[in-house]
Amino acid sequence: MLAATAALVTAVPAAAHDGSARPEEKAALGAEHAQEHTKVREQILKLGGYSQLARIDSLNSLTRSQADVNARFHPKAFGQFAEYFQSPDFAAHIAMLPTGKVLLFSFERMETDPTEEPAPTNTLGKANAGRAFLWDPRRGTGAAAFKKVTPPELVVPDGTNEKRPAPFFCAGHAFLPNGMVGVFGGNLGYGGGAGAKLSLVFDPWTESWSVNKDMEVGRWYPSVAAAPDGRLLIMSGHTDQGWGTSTSVIERFPAKSHPVPFEKTLIPKDVPTDTLRVDAPFGTDSDYPHLFTLRDGKVYGLGRHATKQWAFDPVAETRTDLPARPDGVHRGYGSAVPLPAGLRGPDSVLVLGGDRDDPNTYRLTSGGDWEKQQPRAFGRTQDDTLLLPDASLLTVNGAHGIRDYGNGDYNPKSDLKYRQIETRNALGEWKLGPAQRLPRGYHSNAVVLPDGRVMVTGDELQQLANDPKIDDDMNGSIEIFEPAYLHQGSRPSLDRAPDGPLRYDTAFTVGTSTPDQVKKAVLLAPTTATHSLNTSQRHLELGIVKRQGNSLRLQAPPSANDVPPGYYMLFLLDENGVPSAAKWVSFR
């Protein structure tokens, strides 16, 4: 009887699992029969494991509710979610590469039931393995648009002596000046979060990985940021002794004894880190601290706890205390963004999210002053906030807690509000917008694509709970958001940009077939993100110093303090902030 009725239920459009009968079923079957269908769905959810029917039912429900909510939001004013498709990876870590492709990496799943923990945090041996894929947006949305780029096989000190693809789950990462991604730390598979000493580099030009010398200490949940000289600073993280044994050692990659990799051909292999004279005592409650290099050349470390706030000088190797954040509490996984500052690099950071009870946002200046800014509609954790080409901010994703979407731990059912985006304009005003398809909290991510769209992905629990075909190899999902500026008329055109590296404080020429439409030129840093952490964000205007026919002369930023060396997306904008598609440029 159960199987026969379940088959009938699949033919009916889905709605939320809230214990009530669906209106369309009541109309077609009568109240009593409709309620029977509701009970069947609840029984299916209670069966051993998590059924395929439950996943399809949940995805259909989310699709319907998304359409209902988003009918109220006009794309011209709020933007729209345009695409939703499956991917082969959970994308707990992502990076927007200067080749135009997106690197997705995470772990081999331990569980398909989203009411259980799917990550291998406490799994020894070869089952604790990493995986990685490239998505090429130019190839569309099918399986052929993805390429597997398996990390190097190696042995980690977990006592098993078993080789496996490097378990870089819960590592930290940032870009090197040559466009490569440095990945540091990972998961040893015991102790609730024991940090590996792994040091890897992904080369987007050859689409391959290289292994470097182990770090001095193991790190699980570290943060990494690029200093103005192009070297990466690695801070915090739990050691190889497990959760609660965080390290205060700051490491630098590459070590000062090795050159900074500016050229594409200089691939770091077997390169060591070295340690700074100063430490970073973020403590056990400040995993994945936010790190940002501001235009004074210092790296600002903003811990989860209100008192763990410092500015690090990477040249003098010193640390300066900053005032405590005014909220006075511990903030969990929330976002932070270096705010645009016109023609110069950022000199302030906006801290937001990480506290479900506090919708306020907090701005820290490089002078060490805090001020409360305008609040968002509600508090949320696990959110991702991005800088857009028009200098507005976009928040996607969010949850009530780490694996809690408003209905208890490991319950995939989500409060609708956590699916709604929020945007912040130049005046600092926030407004709620359309809803994404999936709730996405812990391990969710987002990046701005070179065409101005936003890729939203991550959260393996929700991806498993809403997988339309759990037995295939496409257990992740991606959705694409089109900001409002993509619905406000024709776009400027950027046709040519210099191929070689640009020098600071000099002018360079770009070509456009729409010169009269161009009012502004901006740089937007590509980002690499995980766990609501995105240390590479940056937005900078470039002065237009000369116009001649279809050519524009643009003024490069004054120094590496304003724009650390590396690759950036260059956009041309019209008077309404509508951007062109980007061209890649590099600075050194």
Regions found by a protein language model. Give the residues of each.
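Secretory targeting and sorting signals
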Residues: 1-16
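Kelch-like beta-propeller repeat domains
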Residues: 17-588
